[in-house]
Amino acid sequence: MADLLYIRVIYNKRRMKQSFNLFSKYQYLFFDLDGTVTDPMQGITRSVAYALNHFGIVVNDLRELCPFIGPPLKDSFIEFYQFTEVQAEEAVKKYRERYSETGLYENEVYPGMAELLEQARRKGYQLMMATSKPDVFAKLILKHFHLDGYFSFVGGSGLD
């Protein structure tokens, strides 16, 4: 079985060549999507604000919603806004209503990421995407930003 290494890439042109040398014994490189390949802040926080607005909650500073980035949405609505299970499920539906149409395209690819992925592929690495985001959204984001061709596998969560 091949050695696997899960890495969170922080792109730095000066260190890229040195970093690949550190990974030379590995065949597969696993990347997360949010916070590693793309910055999801605008799409996620605007979609959370949209969901909260449905409940009469207005958020003026989207940065207040950054804690929603990463953990499961339902849990975040319960933790940060004391929603009931039913309210949290409805909030997730409202979130996805906006996110599936607009929010997923509001991601920003980190500068230099496409070049890093291209160089890794040229060096013979198999690139994999492992994300907690629903894989249907992850695949759409990668395709939208023309990054889908770099990854031989994209794995994420289901919509439930």
Region spans (language model):
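Asp-based, Mg2+/Mn2+-dependent phosphohydrolase catalytic module
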Residues: 3-7, 13-27, 63, 139-160
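Active-site neighborhood of HAD-like aspartate-dependent phosphohydrolases
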Residues: 17-67
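Substrate-recognition element of Asp-dependent hydrolases with the DxDx(T/V) motif
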Residues: 48, 116-142, 155-157
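Helix-loop "lid/cap" segments that line or gate small-molecule binding pockets
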Residues: 51-52, 72-85, 141
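Short, surface-exposed acidic
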Residues: 58-64, 84-93, 150
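Metal-dependent phosphoesterase signature
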Residues: 78-115
